[in-house]
Amino acid sequence: TVRNVCFSKMIKSKADLNYYLEQDRLALGIKPTLKNKLTHDIWHFQIALRKLEYRKNTGKSVFSKIYAVWLQLKVRKLGRKLGFSIPANVFGPGLSIAHAGIIVINKKCKIGANCRIHVCVNIGGGLSKKGNAPMIGNDCYIGPGAKIYGDITLGDNTAIGANAVVNKSFDGNVTLGGIPAKVISDKGPLDILKKPRTEL
């Protein structure tokens, strides 16, 4: 059993939506200007993704359902432009996508608050019939080229090194690296970066 895993609730209210949007902005290090909202492509994508999550989770009216479809198309269009295939309701608040480039996430994944993710990352379901996907805790760093797959759990405060291939569960507060991945340090990203965490 993997310890130190606590997943954030998904967006269930307008207050949740505003909180997620603000935490994402802070994680990206962006000033809250109209220019940035319109011209910062990654933030633009994340705003659309969070609005889609809100509508999918709360929308019961015909208008909300139609608006959710429009938002889904917008997220898909922006994702194609940036190289992202990121479904709704996967990431907790404080998501920071480092750069435009290929990122593919299975819709069954659950990833906690304060995730920093780089390009050429694939997080998938593996070869099992159930197709269960990884569960990744809070305050995690996913380096460029990392591959994470299967019915596994990674604990809070885990760093995954560049090009690592992770196919089994690990407790938190570690750094993983290699093919297949193994623990290469007993320090996680919070210990290395001293980054303040989002309150859950």
Per-segment meaning from a language model:
Residues 1-82, 190-200:
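Terminal amphipathic alpha-helical/low-complexity segments used for targeting or macromolecular assembly
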Residues 39, 49-56, 114, 118-119, ...:
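Broad hydrophobic/π-residue packing in well-ordered secondary structure
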Residues 40, 88, 93, 125, ...:
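Generic structural "secondary-structure junction" signal
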Residues 93-94, 98-107, 112-113, 117-119, ...:
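Left-handed beta-helix
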Residues 174, 179-194:
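Conserved beta-strand-loop-alpha-helix hinge in the C-terminal portion
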